[in-house]
């Protein structure tokens, strides 16, 4: 259930990927730990890249493991956390674009958000994993996991953008006027004054979006990826697991 088809000899790498997020959270909650917020933010930003390099291998003498062998709780964590981290900066840009005074930028951002929010996630996965490869040039192929994560990332970015836009609207106009009076440029004003207040105001909404995204990762089973739920379903066809369906689904329920 935890690792899917990941090679047993290389599962120490999978263990490192699974235990890193809880360790980061514990460090962030330690009151006496210096720079705990920087560790939390920096750790989760670097986590998807480092996790992918560690799991895929092919670097630093690590044996290469194709993404087709990733599965179970491991795949659920990689897709959920990876898609959230990659979608967050896109969502910030979309929120700023939708609040822009420039009509062209506002129209593009609004169109992007409304398009992806209006598409069911299952349809997005089907188009990105099944249909998109049909239009690629011969010899150009991408792993199904990469295509699925791309679709989920764009889908998540559209919803997070609306959460971030709500935070921007909660910040008083006087904040930006004061920043302009002090000589702050647009990006400095957003980075140091506006965005920290906006994100703090909508932190519960961001957490809800992250939890919802983690649960939505179960949809990858429709494109043949063995996430936690799909690996349990597949294991029940093994004679060794006959009669243990309840235990498997209870475990999935506890995780989610």
Give the residues covered by each predicted segment.
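Transmembrane alpha-helices and adjacent helix-loop boundaries
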Residues: 1-256
């Amino acid at each position: 259930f935890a690792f899917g088809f990941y090679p047993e000899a290389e599962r120490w790498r999978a263990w490192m990927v699974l235990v890193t997020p809880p360790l980061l959270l514990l460090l962030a909650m330690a009151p006496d730990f210096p720079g705990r917020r920087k560790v939390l933010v920096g750790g989760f930003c670097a986590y998807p890249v480092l996790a992918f390099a560690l799991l895929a291998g092919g670097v630093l003498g690590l044996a290469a493991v194709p993404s087709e062998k990733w599965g179970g709780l491991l795949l659920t964590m990689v897709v959920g956390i990876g898609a959230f981290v990659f979608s967050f900066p896109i969502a910030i840009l979309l929120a700023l674009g939708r609040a822009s005074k420039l009509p062209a930028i506002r129209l593009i951002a609004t169109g992007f958000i409304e398009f992806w929010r209006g598409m069911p996630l299952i349809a997005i996965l089907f188009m990105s994993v099944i249909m998109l490869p049909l239009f690629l040039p011969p010899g150009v192929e991408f792993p199904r996991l990469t295509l699925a994560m791309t679709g989920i990332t764009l889908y998540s970015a559209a919803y997070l953008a609306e959460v971030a836009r709500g935070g921007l609207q909660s910040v008083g106009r006087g904040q930006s006027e004061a920043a302009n009076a002090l000589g702050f440029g647009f990006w400095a004003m957003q980075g140091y004054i506006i965005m920290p207040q906006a994100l703090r105001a909508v932190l519960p909404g961001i957490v809800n979006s992250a939890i919802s995204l983690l649960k939505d990762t179960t949809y990858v089973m429709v494109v043949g990826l063995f996430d936690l739920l799909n690996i349990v379903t597949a294991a029940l066809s093994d004679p060794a697991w006959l009669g243990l369906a309840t235990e498997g689904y209870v475990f999935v329920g506890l995780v989610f």
